[in-house]
From Swiss-Prot:
GO CC, any one term: cytosol
Cofactor info, note text: Binds 1 lipoyl cofactor covalently.
Gene3D superfamilies (alphabetical): 2.40.50.100
Cofactors that this protein relies on: (R)-lipoate
The keyword Ubl conjugation is assigned to this record: no
Function: The glycine cleavage system catalyzes the degradation of glycine. The H protein shuttles the methylamine group of glycine from the P protein to the T protein.
Entry keyword set: Lipoyl
Protein name per the record: Glycine cleavage system H protein
Primary gene name: gcvH
Pfam families xrefs: GCV_H (PF01597)
InterPro entries for the chain: 2-oxoA_DH_lipoyl-BS, Biotin_lipoyl, GCV_H, GCV_H/Fam206, GCV_H_sub, Single_hybrid_motif
Length: 127
């Protein structure tokens, strides 16, 4: 299977992506992360109104292979949570960059160390 990394997103070496639109960021996990996790069976996400701090844990993704903590790449306030992925975690694998997003955040602290799609592809493909 060919993994895709949309050019309009920014990536982190921890395999999250973010879509910045003004001062709002949509966070999710990359196709590479989905591929490594396997079948996702449970997702725990913060509540709307929760504050995120860079580097702090904000949720968990559980698969048949592993339980992985999610760490905030930025600071801000959660303004939306994707209830669809909580109810149906497999939605993350079906469409990680679309309907499989995790949270939307009103950004107060921008992340550092963001990678372009090309740089992220090179990282995960070992080039």
């Amino acid at each position: 299977m060919t993994l895709t990394y949309p050019e309009d997103l920014q990536y982190l070496d921890s395999h999250e992506y973010l879509r910045l639109e003004g001062d709002t960021a949509t966070l999710g996990i990359s196709a590479f992360a989905v591929d490594q996790l396997g079948d996702i069976v449970f997702v725990e996400l913060p509540a709307v109104g929760d504050a995120l701090e860079p580097g702090e844990r904000f949720g968990t993704i559980e698969s048949v292979k592993a339980v992985e903590d999610l760490y905030a790449p930025l600071g801000g306030t959660v303004i939306a949570v994707n209830q669809a992925v909580i109810d149906n975690p497999e939605q993350i694998a079906a469409d990680p960059y679309g309907e499989g997003w995790l949270v939307k955040v009103q950004v107060s602290t921008l992340p550092t160390g963001l990678l372009s799609a090309a740089d992220y592809r090179a990282l995960v493909e070992g080039s």
